[in-house]
Amino acid sequence: MKKLIAAFLALCLACSMAACAGGTTSESSTASTSSTSSESSVAEESDASEEPSSSDVSEASYEGSDTAEATVLSHEEYMAAELDTEVTIQAYVQAKQSYYAEQGTATVYLQDQDGAYFAYDMACTQEEYDAMTEGTCIQVTGFKSEWSGEIEIMDGQLDQIVEGDTFVAEPLDATELLGTDELEQHQNEKVSFTGLTVAPSTDANGNEAAFLYNYDGSGTQGDDVYFNVSYNGQTYSFVVESYLCGSDTEVYKAVEALEVGQTIDCEGFLYWYEGANPHITSVTVAA
């Protein structure tokens, strides 16, 4: 009987050990599978992080386009370009309007030996604006546009200040071109007019005046100053742009002192608004 009990106990012990061994194998297998899965996931995440995202590709493409060298157009090519197309030009600063600090832009009158350009609200820094002295060559990229007859570069930016030679244009005497189709071909150029007669304007109250603050007389000192001149029986509207020549400048004060009937000579830039509307920088009353 004792032998039978001993044999039974031995059998139970063997079964118990086998069960323990089986449990260990299962746990080991589970741990191994979990570890392998985790390592695979980490590897996949690592590979994914090394792949460029669509935004990365887009940024890389954009940066590449910035570095592409733009084709600089001659004045003839610029004039032949379609409206609303992007253009790049190089020309010399002849004058500039005040810097718009909030927008980071400036309006610049440009000219080379072949013609002139008007860069409206060109993006640049204050430091770049200060460096653009008369005669300085700059490169500008923007869109060729038309506004009320004026051909200009809009939404532009200063690409660079070009080191080297300088150029200051001599005014073209455009007096005899007044009233002709040829005058428009010199749009935005530095021009002069001689022997003009101050013609009357009508202010907001219907009174005759030699000049007006704003085109309709609704302004005050410090605003643009408009005045009429006549030549060969035709009357033209000229303006002193306050952002170009403020109320403290000689030309602004000279226009404020004009009298109807006086003979004057003028210099300025041949801006266009529904016809010739020069931005005047100098007025001299004939002796």
Where are these regions (language model features)?
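Hydrophobic alpha-helical membrane-embedded or membrane-associated segments
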Residues: 10-14
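C-terminal motif of bacterial Sec signal peptides marking the signal peptidase cleavage site
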Residues: 15-19
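OB-fold single-stranded nucleic acid-binding module
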Residues: 23, 57-287
